[in-house]
A protein has these predicted regions:
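Short, surface-exposed loop and linker segments with low hydrophobicity and enrichment for Pro/Ser/Thr
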Residues: 1-5, 39, 142-156, 224-229
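Active-site-adjacent structural segments surrounding the nucleophilic cysteine of cysteine proteases
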Residues: 3-117
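Extracytoplasmic/secreted proteins, especially bacterial periplasmic and envelope-associated proteins
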Residues: 13, 27, 31, 86, ...
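Short, flexible beta-strand-to-coil junctions
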Residues: 34, 160-164, 236-237
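A structural signal for well-ordered alpha-helical scaffolds and beta->alpha junctions
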Residues: 89, 120-121, 211-212
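Catalytic cysteine-centered active-site loop
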Residues: 102-145
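Active-site-adjacent substructure of cysteine-protease-like catalytic cores
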Residues: 138-197
Length: 237
């Protein structure tokens, strides 16, 4: 039709595939946002009609929570032959892979080995920083920390006690990746599989991706010394 404008990209098509937390998609959205702000500053205000329609006057379902698209790695098949004790490395590898720094936990393990043992938090921090990531070991995290980090697109390494009853957790500790938080659960990528968070130990070697661990039973295993005592590693680009 004469005078018609050709549209090369439809936002409606792009939104179908957008996942907050994917670095390349977030970067592209930021670029588009900056272009729109520069060319049409008024269009980006919340009082605009398009935003009211989008938000349905603030009536979105509050239970719709973000789960980050973190690739899964199992510690059980590590080429090192020591996968049974490499939960920390396989968890760190998932986050490094999420940021596009490694191909998997075997590659990550070869890098981490330069800095120390898999159980050594300092070795993990050095390996992550070597890959160009910001990494900080923390011992005073809480549920709010996980909500903030995951809602802003950053998965968190969490260290917790996986043996014994949730009422009296024990053991040397286990590491997994917190990829989201909902009203009743902390959502994990657990490199060892599906934990029995009520009684301790593991139910299955399978099912470790996007597993919902009930806050009622998992938090006592993480917040052992109080509501602000969670161990974890905060990682960002």
């Amino acid at each position: 039709m004469k005078g018609a404008v050709s549209i090369s990209v439809r936002l409606s098509d792009l939104f179908k595939y957008y996942k907050h937390g994917l670095p390349h998609q977030d970067a592209a959205v930021k670029m588009l946002e900056e272009k729109l702000m520069a060319a049409y500053p008024d269009l980006m205000h919340k009082d605009q009609e398009w935003f009211k329609v989008w938000s349905q006057a603030g009536k979105q379902t509050v239970n719709e929570k973000l789960v980050l698209n973190v690739p899964y790695e199992s510690q059980r098949d590590n080429k090192s032959g020591a996968g049974f004790r490499e939960c920390f490395s396989s968890s760190a590898a998932m986050v490094a892979k999420f940021y596009g720094k490694v191909s998997g936990d075997d590659e990550y393990n070869s890098i981490r080995a330069r800095f120390g043992d898999s159980t050594d938090s300092a070795a993990q921090i050095q390996a992550l920083r070597f890959l160009g990531l910001h990494a900080e070991f923390k011992q005073a995290l809480n549920v709010g920390s996980l909500e903030k980090e995951t809602s802003e697109g950053r998965p968190v390494l969490v260290g917790w006690l996986h043996h014994g009853s949730y009422k009296a957790p024990s053991g040397g500790g286990h590491w997994s990746v917190a990829v989201g938080v909902d009203d009743t659960s902390i959502i994990h990528n657990d490199p060892y599989g599906m934990a029995d968070i009520v009684n301790g130990g593991y139910k299955s070697a399978q099912g470790g991706k996007y597993i919902h661990y009930s806050k009622q039973y998992w938090l006592p295993r993480w917040l052992v010394e109080g509501p602000n005592s969670g161990w974890g590693v905060l990682i960002s680009e």
